[in-house]
Structure formats: C-alpha cells, structure tokens
Amino acid sequence: MVGEPKRHTAEDNAVTMTQPRQQDPAYFEMLYEKYATDVLRVSYFYLGDRQKAEDVTQDVFVRLMLNAPVLQEGREKAWLLKVALNRCRDLWRGAWLKRVVLGSPAFELVPAPDEIGKLADEQELMGAINQLPANFKEVILLHYYQGYGINEIAEMMDLPEGTISSRLSRGRKKLESILKGGDVL
C-alpha cells in the first residue's frame, strides 16, 4: 500500500546483497544495528579493555564500508566476527599492548556442562585461561563465555569444525592441568 512505512524483512537483506554496497547505506546501518553488540562483546573478551574493544568495533564496520566485500546471505555475522578476531589478534600481538586482562564482573560466565562450568572461583579460572596458548584461549572464550556453537566458531575462524572441537577438548584438558597446579605444556 502507498504511504505505509516499509518493514525490514529477510527479503530486504537479499535485495541489498545485489546492490552495490557503497550505494546502500541502509545495508550498513542494518548490519551495524544487528551485530555491533556481538562484535564489541567478542572484542572486549579478547582484549579486556572496553576502549580498545570499541575501537576494534568501529574499525570492523569502517572496513566493511570501505572494502564492501561480497558477503553470502546469512554469513554477515561470521565475516564481521572474523575481522574483529583478526584485528584483536593484531592488537594483542602488538608491542604496545603488553598485558591482556580478561574478564569483568559486567559479563557473567555462561555455565558449561563440564567441570570448567562448575568452578566456584571465576578469578582462578580466568587466570588459568590467560595461561593458555592463544588458539585454545580463543575457542574457550568464544564457546563458554560468548555462547557460540562449534559451527559458528569454525565459521568465524575459518577452520574445520573438527579443529574447533579438538581445541575445545585440548583446551579443557590444559585448563584442568593448570588448575591442578601443572604446566600448560
């Protein structure tokens, strides 16, 4: 009908996928509204610094607008989170970022069905997670703290699901060893 406001639907996403990105600011706005919080949350957990996480979030969406990649429908979130993780890794490895402090009372630990989720002392757990190699730390944080499934993490990190499952399993074993007073190995 003429004069009625247009509602945003899944078909709108499909239509914008065929339009040039630089000419479709509504597409970028829709992606920002939908996924900025997820990008910020993942960045914050990785970096442990709200300001740096906000900078990464801004950088991700600026890259989206400038590069205008052709994204498959339904995979936009995976692309955004992958770019955010890569940017966080760059910052984390950078010489100016010497220390990573993960965790905050502002975000709750999502209980896991195994022993990791049963630990009473979250500070001890975060200290143990900080001792893990980066590849295990990433999947542990994304799965247990952010609640992403194995398939979502695999898509974000551009790795096979089996690799993610293996890293989760090995990461849990390493955490158990650390918490019992052993080395990371």
Protein language model features and the residues they cover:
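N-terminal module of bacterial RNA polymerase sigma factors
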Residues: 1-38, 45, 121-122, 126-130, ...
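Arg/Lys-rich amphipathic alpha helix in sigma70-family domain 2
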Residues: 82-103, 118, 170
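Internal acidic/polar
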Residues: 9-13, 98-127, 149
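C-terminal flanking helix
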Residues: 36, 40, 61, 133, ...
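A short pre-motif secondary-structure segment
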Residues: 139-143
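Structural recognition of an alpha-helix C-terminal capping motif at a helix-to-coil junction
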Residues: 55-62, 66, 74-86
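DNA-recognition helix of helix-turn-helix
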Residues: 85, 157-181
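Residues within helix-turn-helix
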Residues: 51, 151, 162
